């Protein structure tokens, strides 16, 4: 096999083996008896071969040093390539994220363009917008959830039914047959009862009848007339109707003022 097809390591090992063989022949010829020594011509050829192998060894060692430097440069280049690969992968991930963001933005932009085109095809006058805004303000609705759509019953404020179902809406009704009263009024009743007891039966301060007014589950207010007289129903509808009329009048005035301002 030609030496050019061998690696540098194999060539070095082959040269060292040749030098070892030549050196062994020279040493054996030196210590051999005179009758067994080789001729001077053969000895000279072995010496020339040894010198040639030595030069070849030095050249191969120089080549190995050059190859070691090249290998070092290759390692440095591999490290740079690895770092560049990491940067490329990071940039690729960022490009993927940017592509996704751009795709989302384009989709949303197309939706907005479609909405604009639809709005341009069916324009709405300012008077209609003012009327619709007035309807919203008349119902005390100032905003709606972000996900609100046509037909959604949700409002940003509690309705009358929700307020009546709450604890505050039931504070003036009977619960389990007992009236809910303010703690201060209960304390005053106890103090009045104790004062009457201290003054005696002939005192000037009349005894206040507890539970004189009571709400029935039907919503009517009843006043107790005594132990044997029973109770009398009080009509509060007139006051409620008057309050409702006042509210309607105020709402009508505010509506007319809003319409005049908008015009």
Swiss-Prot record:
Pfam families membership: Med4 (PF10018)
GO molecular function: transcription coregulator activity
Biased composition (Low complexity): 251-263
Annotated segments matching region Disordered: 209-228, 235-263
Subcellular location: Nucleus
GO CC annotations on file: core mediator complex; mediator complex
Coiled-coil stretches: 61-111
Family matches, as InterPro entries: Mediator_Med4
Tree of life domain: Eukaryota
Keywords noted in UniProt: Activator, Coiled coil, Nucleus, Transcription, Transcription regulation
GO biological-process terms attached to the record: regulation of transcription by RNA polymerase II
Task performed by this protein: Component of the Mediator complex, a coactivator involved in the regulated transcription of nearly all RNA polymerase II-dependent genes. Mediator functions as a bridge to convey information from gene-specific regulatory proteins to the basal RNA polymerase II transcription machinery. Mediator is recruited to promoters by direct interactions with regulatory proteins and serves as a scaffold for the assembly of a functional preinitiation complex with RNA polymerase II and the general transcription factors.
Subunit description: Component of the Mediator complex.
Family, as annotated: Belongs to the Mediator complex subunit 4 family.
Name the UniProt record assigns to this protein: Mediator of RNA polymerase II transcription subunit 4
Species lineage: Eukaryota, Metazoa, Ecdysozoa, Arthropoda, Hexapoda
Gene: MED4
């Amino acid at each position: 096999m030609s030496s050019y097809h061998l690696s540098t390591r194999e060539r070095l090992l082959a040269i060292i083996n040749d030098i070892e063989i030549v050196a062994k022949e020279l040493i054996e010829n030196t210590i051999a008896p005179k009758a067994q020594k080789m001729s001077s011509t053969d000895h000279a050829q072995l010496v020339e071969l040894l010198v040639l192998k030595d030069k070849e060894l030095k050249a191969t060692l120089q080549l190995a040093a050059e190859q070691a430097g090249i290998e070092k440069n290759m390692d440095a280049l591999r490290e740079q390539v690895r770092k560049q690969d990491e940067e490329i992968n990071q940039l690729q991930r960022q490009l993927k994220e940017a592509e996704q963001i751009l795709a989302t933005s384009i989709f949303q932009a197309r939706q907005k363009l479609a909405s604009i085109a639809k709005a341009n095809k069916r324009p709405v006058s300012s008077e209609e917008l003012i009327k619709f805004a007035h309807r919203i303000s008349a119902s005390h609705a100032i905003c709606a959830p972000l996900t609100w759509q046509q037909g959604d019953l949700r409002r940003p404020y509690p309705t009358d039914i929700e307020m009546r179902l709450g604890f505050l809406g039931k504070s003036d009704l009977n619960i389990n047959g007992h009236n809910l009263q303010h703690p201060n009024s209960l304390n005053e009743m106890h103090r009045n009862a104790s004062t009457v007891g201290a003054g005696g039966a002939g005192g000037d301060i009349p005894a206040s009848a507890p539970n004189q007014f009571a709400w029935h589950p039907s919503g009517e207010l009843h006043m107790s007339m005594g132990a044997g007289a029973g109770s009398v129903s009080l009509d509060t509808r007139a006051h409620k109707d008057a309050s409702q009329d006042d509210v309607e009048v105020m709402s009508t005035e505010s509506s007319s003022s809003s319409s005049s301002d908008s015009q």
